[in-house]
C-alpha cells in the first residue's frame, strides 16, 4: 500500500469494563470529590433498563453494533473518546455532559442540545458522511434514544446545570520542553 492509499482497519473488540467497586451514585470516592455514576449492572429490569443496556452496548461498540453501525464511517466508538464507557472522570465522562446541555458551542455558534451534540460526534468523530447511510442518526432513532437513556442513567444523582463538575472534560496538559505540535 502506497503513502496515498489507506487500508481499512480490522475491527477491534470492545474494551473490558473497569470495576470501580461499590460506590453509590452521586457519592464521592476518596478526597477528590468526584461524581460517581451508578454501579455497573444496576440498571432497572424494565423497558428503561433495556434501553440503558442497549445504549451502553452501542457506546462501547458503536461501529459494529447492529443499531449504530450504519451511521459510522470508520472504526470509532463513543468509548474511544469517552473512556471506561463514558464513566471515567477526567476522560470526558458522559455524566458531566448530560447535566451541561443545552449549551452554546463555538464550533457552530449556536445552542446545542445533548442530542445535537451526540449527532455531532457521529458526524465529525465517526465520519457519518462516509457511513452506509451518509448521515448521523436522526433525533428519534433507536440509536439516539438508547444512547440518551444510557447517558441519562450515568448522570443519576448529578447536579443538573453544573457545567463545572470536577472530572468534566480532560485534564489540562503542561507544555512539553519541545512544545506542542
What are the functions of these language-model segments?
Residues 97-103:
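Catalytic and substrate-binding regions of cell-wall glycan-acting enzymes that process beta-1,4-linked
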Residues 55, 75-86, 147, 181:
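The canonical Cys-X-X-Cys-His
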Residues 1-64, 103-181:
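Post-cleavage N-terminal segment of exported redox proteins
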Residues 82-89, 126, 155:
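Short alpha-helix boundary/capping elements
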Residues 90-96:
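Short cysteine/histidine-rich zinc-coordinating motifs and their immediately flanking basic loops
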Residues 61-76:
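Local sequence-structure signature of Cys/Sec-based thiol-disulfide redox active-site neighborhoods
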